[in-house]
Amino acid sequence: MMGRPEGLKLIDENGRRIDGRRKYELRKIHMEVGVLKNADGSAYIEWGKNKILAAVYGPREIHPKHLQRPDTAVLRVRYNMAPFSVEERKKPGPDRRSVEISKVIRGALEPALILEMFPRTVVDVFIEVLQADAGTRVAGITAASLALADAGVPMRDLVAACAAGKIDGEIVLDLNKDEDNYGEADVPVAIMPLKNDITLLQMDGYLTKEEFIEAVKLAIKGAKAVYQKQREALKEKYLKIAQEVAGDE
């Protein structure tokens, strides 16, 4: 949260936000599955102005071998922002924020994966932010979950994520960059809808207890809408495969 430029209104007198959305409206979301031929699973997501690519490799042999776990696979997640992903060029390579978000995303995904089926192996997840516009962690979780499903890693459910927040004293869904910079709070949430489980819940900023509950409920509602888009993207991929197989016969 940053100091706001004088006179900047995040919600106008008609209840419209700075990008024209209403309070409970998601940004435009586009998802594609199976976009990288050399990965075991992959997904690409455009969420507002965010552009994020996720790739999964494994389960595969883990090196060095002392990292092996005899009863389960190891999940490794690397979240990275490309140097050109933000307006001010970022130094290449992982920074403290990227390392922290990698751990957060791993924690959000791990409950959904049946890793005990593949002991002594590793599942590697790479998330590359090509363009950033607030909400990269929830978009990254959403893309990574799709890529894991595409790779055929056994899952209890997809993980879908969304954030709610507070701007100009109002609880709203899916903050954009200006709202994230100049708003009062941000609450990212990840869920497994079929299990009715929350796998990520964070808060940045200040909310009353009532506002926090409202924000969490709104973020869950948004995540359920994202979940439907994930399912549609997976169906679209396998429909294409079925059509290609039918065409070859």
Curated annotation (Swiss-Prot):
Keywords: Cytoplasm, Exonuclease, Exosome, Hydrolase, Nuclease. Its main location: cytoplasm. GO terms for biological process: gene expression; rRNA catabolic process. It comes from the Archaea. It is found in: Cytoplasm. One of its GO terms (cellular component) is cytoplasmic exosome (RNase complex). HAMAP family: Exosome_Rrp41 (MF_00591). Catalytic component of the exosome, which is a complex involved in RNA degradation. Has 3'->5' exoribonuclease activity. Can also synthesize heteromeric RNA-tails. InterPro entries: ExoRNase_PH_dom1, ExoRNase_PH_dom2, ExoRNase_PH_dom2_sf, PNPase/RNase_PH_dom_sf, Ribosomal_Su5_D2-typ_SF, RNase_PH, Rrp41. GO terms for molecular function: 3'-5'-RNA exonuclease activity; RNA binding. Belongs to the RNase PH family. Rrp41 subfamily. It comes from Thermococcus gammatolerans (strain DSM 15229 / JCM 11827 / EJ3). Its EC number is 3.1.13.-. This is Exosome complex component Rrp41. CDD domains: RNase_PH_archRRP41. Signal peptide: none annotated. Component of the archaeal exosome complex. Forms a hexameric ring-like arrangement composed of 3 Rrp41-Rrp42 heterodimers. The hexameric ring associates with a trimer of Rrp4 and/or Csl4 subunits.
